[in-house]
Design a protein with these regions (language model features):
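Pyridoxal 5′-phosphate
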Residues: 1-394
């Protein structure tokens, strides 16, 4: 299989991740913080080390605490539902946001009745900073959510500039780093984010089952989930300090062990440099494919290793299904859980895109095979492919 769906999850993982998880699962996968015996203490120490590595990664020492969660969607729900909302609240979201942000906000908006607005885009689909500043002045924000990197076009959004404006109005700022933490060099203090989320299985090259967020020191959240924590068990109340206040239930120590190993591997991998090289290689050669419409960042300086496209004569679902069935190439088709941005793309009426997302282990030869497959799909009549059976996948 030629795997080009790294925005969904990076695959494969570094070999050290598989080795660490296998060994830990066989010999040390006990419940951390739930016992005084050696193995439980060692599991707890491994979790502490993982938090420390995450703090170092985002240069967040003495700036933030790391709260762990089983997925970044859970983490974002903890943040959004952990805030206090009123009818007077004003939330701004970029059009690039994922449903992990949009759906919790919509749920609360319907219940409470506050305002949700989209950040404006310029003609090239970059965030219009001047218009953003004007909108903030006209209707001051109480909450601003921005994706660090679009999971549709690979656009690296100007989060620091947006949050600098938002902080003039003391807004809570949320940076969705699912496609960025581990890839971009982030300095937590410079971001001006109150919360920065991460997904272990994406740009951190760890496994599923471990994610979380950095929460700025001094920022508090209401409790969404309650239960056992392994501490203060004599009380019916959750612990009052972070991260314990926001973490309940047994942790997936095997997944955390995998992330621990990935964090040791990342500094030497230079994944951003690798993605930029691969993206440049792809972009230089895409014009050789007739009938291709491309959706990407406004320019290469703000482009990560994710690009979207559509192929004339085929729905995104049809093209992706043919790439899979005939060429064993894995890409994503659809709206990528980010429908708002599709309203701004030239794929009206919002039919979705073919997404190609590269990772550290992608080879240039695999990109060549993708390009040749796209050319072949355009050349052939495909009479032997049951397109009717493929419709509706998008």
């Amino acid at each position: 299989m030629i795997y080009l769906d790294n925005a969904a999850t990076t695959f494969p993982k570094p070999e050290c991740v598989y080795t660490a998880m296998d060994s830990f699962a066989r010999h040390a996968a006990v419940n951390a913080g739930r016992g005084a015996y050696r193995a439980a203490r060692e599991a707890g120490e491994m979790i502490r080390e993982t938090r420390e590595k995450l703090i170092s990664l985002a240069d967040a020492r003495e700036q933030a605490q790391v709260v762990l969660a089983p997925s970044v969607t859970v983490a974002i729900n903890q943040i959004i539902h952990g805030l206090t909302w009123t009818e007077q609240s004003v939330a701004y979201v970029s059009p690039y946001e994922h449903n992990a942000v949009l759906r919790p906000l919509e749920q609360l908006r319907k219940k409470i009745g506050f305002t949700v607005l989209e950040l404006p885009l310029a003609e090239d689909l970059s965030v219009d900073l001047a218009e953003t500043e004007r909108m903030f002045a006209e209707l001051p924000p109480t909450f601003v959510a921005v994706s660090a990197v679009s999971n549709v076009t690979g656009y690296i959004l100007p989060a620091e500039k947006i949050f600098r404006m938002a902080k003039k109005y003391k807004a809570f700022t949320l940076l969705d780093g699912a496609q960025a933490v581990g890839l971009l060099k982030l300095h937590f203090a410079a971001l001006r984010a109150d919360a920065l989320t991460f997904a272990g299985h994406k740009t951190l090259y760890g496994p599923f089952g471990i994610a979380g967020f950095y929460l700025k020191n001094g920022v508090d959240l209401n409790i969404l989930l309650s239960g056992g924590t392994g501490s203060q068990s004599e009380s019916l109340e959750m612990p009052r300090t972070i991260p314990g206040k926001l973490e309940c239930a047994s942790k997936d120590t095997v997944a955390i062990c995998g992330l621990h190993a990935a964090l040791d591997w990342l500094p030497s991998a230079h994944t951003l440099q690798r993605e930029k090289e691969l993206t440049a290689y792809l972009m230089e050669r895409l014009p050789t494919v007739d009938g291709l419409t491309l959706y990407c960042a406004p320019d290469e300086t703000c482009q990560a290793g994710i690009v979207s496209m559509n192929l004339e004569g085929f729905s995104c679902g049809e093209a992706a299904a043919i790439l899979d069935a005939k060429y064993d190439i894995a890409v994503r088709a659809g709206h990528h859980c980010a429908a708002l941005i599709h309203r701004h793309l030239n794929d009206a009426p919002c039919k979705g895109t073919i997404r190609v997302s590269m990772g550290y282990f992608t080879e240039t030869g695999e990109i060549d095979l993708l390009l040749e497959a796209l050319r072949s799909i355009r050349r052939e009549d495909l009479k032997n492919v049951d397109l009717e059976a493929l419709r509706g996948l998008c």
